[in-house]
Amino acid sequence: MVTPTFQVPGLSSQPKDYLDVPWDMFGELCRALALRVARDYQPDLVVGIARAGVIPAAVVASILRVDFYSMKISRKEGDEQVRERPAILSAAPTQAAGKRVLLVDEIATSGETLRMALAAVRDVRPVEVRTATSFARTQGYKPDYFALETDATVIFPWDRKIFEEGELVVNPRYASVLDE
């Protein structure tokens, strides 16, 4: 895969270990991802992997003007990791049968979640299924399509501030690197 041909404002000024993604940058990445997919593949529907993968999946589906569905695969319940390996918590949509499917997650690291989702979607018997993520790592699993390659810890706009004790606060995981 080639890296995106668009410039991301503010990207070069960020700490190398973290990539703080504001909503406008996320939108640009989704548009770039949708364009990359559309140049090579015409999915009939998009399946997003909950929880975070449904966000780029819904945006990409909207841009591509196709139906959107979700499935849930996770190691977590809420914000707490409760499993060593990801588990399928809601099945692949049966609407994928006989269709060209684009399977979307927010990031590909080890690829374990995407591989599990890919197998589950294939069990529904689509015509074809391809994978896409907003971000991919330089090493490890590569989806068929991704918007940006980085080894930085990605701070997604929906995870930057969280609801805690009755108010929105900077996510404690990122407080030391965010200027707020």
Regions found by a protein language model. Give the residues of each.
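Active-site-facing substrate-recognition patch
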Residues: M1-P43
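Conserved glycine-rich SAM-binding loop
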Residues: A52, T109, T113
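Short, glycine/charge-rich flexible loops or terminal/linker lids adjacent to PRPP-binding catalytic cores
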Residues: S62-L102, E112-A119
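Glycine-rich phosphate-binding loop signature in dinucleotide/nucleotide-binding domains
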Residues: R39-Q42, Q95-A97, V124-R125
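Conserved PRPP/pyrophosphate-binding segment of the phosphoribosyltransferase/PRPP-pathway fold
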Residues: E28-D79
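A structural signal for isolated positions on well-ordered beta-strands in alpha/beta enzyme cores
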Residues: L45, Y69, L102, R130-A132
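PRPP-dependent phosphoribosyltransferase catalytic core
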Residues: V2-D17, A119-E180
